[in-house]
């Protein structure tokens, strides 16, 4: 009963903390023509290729070189099982004028450029180009180079 003497039902009694509804990993892909492919990619849990904390994937946004470096580094780490790669260059001075050594993608960029998988955007000016979009030709070349590097780690290659 409340202060006026009326009966009321407690909303707390119906609320069950043991029951939760899982939110979709990405809520902005519902009507996307590649939804099934995006959901498959999300299941792989590749760093740099996941939905943000607000469950947005932004399927039509261009991928930056910084994000792409994270993706390739994560694949390299997963296949080689060398977790030390993720911190190999931390604490080093950045060789690029447009990338700080404390940037979230710094180690990934250094790992991939040191292995020749990704090129710097402008070697003369010393720029990696982290915010530049990744172009199709760069993707094809870097994936071939990554595949060549990983051949010895994968059976049947």
Predicted regions and their residues:
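Positions within ordered alpha-helical repeat solenoids
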Residues: 43, 74, 114, 145-148
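Feature responds to low-complexity, polar/acidic, surface-exposed segments characteristic
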Residues: 1-35, 49-69, 74-106, 119-136, ...
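Hydrophobic core segments within long, regular secondary-structure runs in both alpha-
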Residues: 38-42, 73, 109-110
């Amino acid at each position: 009963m409340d202060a006026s003497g009326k009966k009321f039902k407690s909303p707390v009694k119906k609320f069950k903390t043991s029951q939760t509804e899982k939110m979709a990993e990405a809520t902005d892909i519902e009507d996307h023509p590649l939804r099934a492919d995006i959901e498959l990619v999300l299941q792989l849990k590749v760093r740099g290729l996941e939905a943000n904390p607000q469950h947005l994937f932004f399927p039509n946004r261009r991928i930056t070189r910084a994000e792409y470096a994270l993706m390739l580094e994560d694949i390299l780490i997963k296949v080689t099982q060398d977790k030390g790669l993720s911190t190999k260059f931390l604490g080093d001075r950045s060789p690029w004028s447009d990338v700080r050594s404390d940037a979230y993608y710094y180690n990934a960029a250094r790992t991939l450029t040191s292995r020749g998988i990704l090129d710097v955007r402008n070697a003369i000016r010393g720029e990696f180009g982290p915010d530049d979009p990744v172009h199709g030709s760069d993707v094809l070349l870097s994936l071939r180079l990554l595949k060549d590097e990983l051949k010895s780690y994968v059976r049947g290659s």
